[in-house]
Amino acid sequence: MSPLTRRRLVGLAAFGGLGVLAGCSTSDPLQSSAPAPGTAAPGTTAAGGGTLVVGSQQYYSNEIIAELYAQAIEGAGYTVERQYQIGQREVYLPELEAATIDVLPEYSGNLLQYYDKAATATDPAGVTAALETALPAGLRVLAAAEASDQDSYTVTKAFADEHGLTAIGDLTKAPQPVRLAANSEFAIRPYGPEGAKATYGVDIELVPVEDSGGPLTARALKDGTVQVADLYTADPTIAKEGFVILEDPEGLILPQNVIPIVSEKVDATAAAAIEAVNAKLTVAELQALNARSVDEQARSADIAKDWLSQQGLA
């Protein structure tokens, strides 16, 4: 068993004590969609610039972004090893710190709060600036994309209409506690149950659903298993199902712009290739990429290859 696999299992086991609503789903957008680790994606070659390991969270959209970076790096002459669907921050950030992974797409606000729980920055530029001093030695972030994909407190339109909900604080109008579907680590996030109670006076009962805001989480919301779900804002399911994202006037959830976190092995040439991707990655573009995965069940490698070609980056 490799060190990465061993650490991954330990990290996942840390949340094993919570009851979990999870299981296999045929609608998992990216199940086994990535090229094998150490192989180039279709239509790309890898040679000449050394080897970089690109990782992704256990989240289909994050894998798509990771594959964009991977293919862009390969196009710049590097060999890429892929380590996708690793897990959440408690698992993969130690791997980055140990230089087992060299590149991983992150989300600015959540990354900042992982390293600095007392962070006070609330706007995108301030969050990015704060990250530059919050990260441990050996890690740095590159330029953030315009695209963001934020955690959210999302409800069905029927539930919003029934209780007159437009903002997170309005959840106090509904019977307490409110059941919320999210990954189990939501329990310890600053915007989780404790944050919702302290900021808005809302009592949250977490129902763990381990698919990172994916189809199981959406299904739990739609069928009434829960009243609220942590769906990510670039998910096309929100618009398709007519779900309502509750406003967050107090800034409980920080801006979550897509931002690459990289090791010291990422040189100027590789960094430029990654930043060229981020320069083109808008909110609309990310939503379109995600829609191809959800609606077409397209592989991350194919989605990335097509998009890079369309953007003149291939």
PLM features: residue spans?
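N-terminal secretory signal peptides and thylakoid transit peptides that target proteins
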Residues: 1-16
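A conserved helix-loop-strand patch within extracytoplasmic ligand-binding domains
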Residues: 124-180, 279-283
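Short, well-ordered beta-strand elements
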Residues: 48-61, 80-83, 176-181
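A bilobed periplasmic-binding-protein/Venus flytrap-type ligand-binding module shared by bacterial periplasmic
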Residues: 151-161, 256-269
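C-terminal motif of bacterial Sec signal peptides marking the signal peptidase cleavage site
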Residues: 20-23
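Short, low-complexity, disordered segments immediately C-terminal to signal peptides
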Residues: 25-47
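Ligand-binding "clamshell"
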Residues: 115-142, 225-228, 237-250
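Ligand-binding pocket segment of bilobal, Venus flytrap-like solute-binding proteins
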Residues: 177-248
